[in-house]
């Protein structure tokens, strides 16, 4: 076959295949264009999840008839200065979106330039039959996309169910709406309003907070730490959830670079590292984090859909993000999720009666109904029986030394002033019940002490080496490639301080002679394989932190107070005071709460008071 030039329509369809994967891709490109046009209001209408119809309307600057003709040609844009290609501040800049979408659909664009007398309209079918006519329209632009992928039936065949495609579009709109709280957004599907976000015109922090409440929810804000971190060429702001408020998936993690939503592996790893001391590996924090960086230090032109970025100094960015998140979490290190207490109260209101053993319905002939009360007239008012009260008052009381009683009362009053209150009782030798001025607190003694031990051992490992145990038979670990073996060998001195002694054994193998004493039952093969993976994929800091976490968790769990151990009042109060003075004592090492606080007003509501 001879080499030949492709037709313009074929080129556009190929470009569409790179940029336009599904209806959500169309919505993303067109809404981003509307944002770049300076819109304050953007409305999206869909039919059949966008397969039949997509309409995007905005009140932006609009276009003239000449601009309409140029806009649907490839590589035409108003957003890119050729002399400064690296200094990009807009969403779009390649000039590919409109012609790519037009090539695979039936497109109608109606637009009126701000201050102009007339509106104009252009119609394209499969990218052809371009015709500009005079029309009637308000200032701004409306783009209608019908029969998406009609020109590429193979792509249409691979679209998912309407529900799945719609969910992808909703996700796209939420991300763009989060990045632009000053703009109003609405999304309607088959005449049903799905999203409606009102634009905010207050200060930036208030605008962002309200938009996050609209998109992610009020519970998130109540259980999130505010991030405000700045360097001369870098700033990070947003909200990230406290460890006890987490999810089973990462779908509520929103990350932005210069207001551009991205899914970047480096940023996701940084997020994981920031939380690895506080969350189990199968749990994920929620966040909406915005990184502002000099455009010349980040390349957004590495992916057709601009969903990925490349940093000039990725390690610097990663470390700053980890530091910013940890600083924010430290400010809320003693707080547990507000939803935990509400969930507990809900269980009180609706006990799991179905899980209780069934009770025989047989009743004794002499038994009375549980709610039996003697009949009395509505006007009846009981009067106090003073004689009975006097009799009760004369009953003997336990003989308690007055001085001891006063001392205990004084100590209780002092302890009640603390955040976790004064210890009152121990339930099932597992849970500490304490009282504050306006609540009761239930503390899991094992989880709490494990966290305290974890933090103490972490501090110890910063200055001291771990006790090592020599293996009777050294373990030889064969790795997939030489690069991973080299990564381990290059970090052998740091691993030695953590109790791991190893040497190279051939090109792709490592021989382990000593391990941390506390990890006597560890699977050495798996430990070394995991370390090698983390060192090669994520870098030295993350891999070594993973090992420290593993060792520290084992120590903390082994030496912590066990459930089932009886504690004195002094021991319980001492544990509570330690928790108040220890960072991140509100959750165990797996993100579960160490205590639950029930407010007195909520308890009173349970009893209808």
UniProtKB/Swiss-Prot annotation:
SUPFAM superfamilies: ATPase domain of HSP90 chaperone/DNA topoisomerase II/histidine kinase, DNA mismatch repair protein MutL, Ribosomal protein S5 domain 2-like. GO terms for biological process: mismatch repair. The keyword DNA repair applies. InterPro entries: DNA_mismatch_repair_CS, DNA_mismatch_repair_MutL, DNA_mismatch_S5_2-like, HATPase_C_sf, MutL/Mlh/PMS, MutL/Mlh/Pms-like, MutL_C, MutL_C_dimsub. PROSITE patterns: DNA_MISMATCH_REPAIR_1 (PS00058). GO terms for molecular function: ATP binding; ATP hydrolysis activity; ATP-dependent DNA damage sensor activity; mismatched DNA binding. Gene3D superfamilies: 3.30.230.10, Histidine kinase-like ATPase, C-terminal domain, MutL, C-terminal domain, dimerisation subdomain, MutL, C-terminal domain, regulatory subdomain. Keywords: DNA damage, DNA repair. It comes from the Bacteria. GO terms for cellular component: mismatch repair complex. Coiled coil: none annotated. CDD domains: HATPase_MutL-MLH-PMS-like (cd16926), MutL_Trans (cd00782). This protein is involved in the repair of mismatches in DNA. It is required for dam-dependent methyl-directed DNA mismatch repair. May act as a 'molecular matchmaker', a protein that promotes the formation of a stable complex between two or more DNA-binding proteins in an ATP-dependent manner without itself being part of a final effector complex. Belongs to the DNA mismatch repair MutL/HexB family. This is DNA mismatch repair protein MutL. It comes from Rickettsia felis (strain ATCC VR-1525 / URRWXCal2) (Rickettsia azadi).
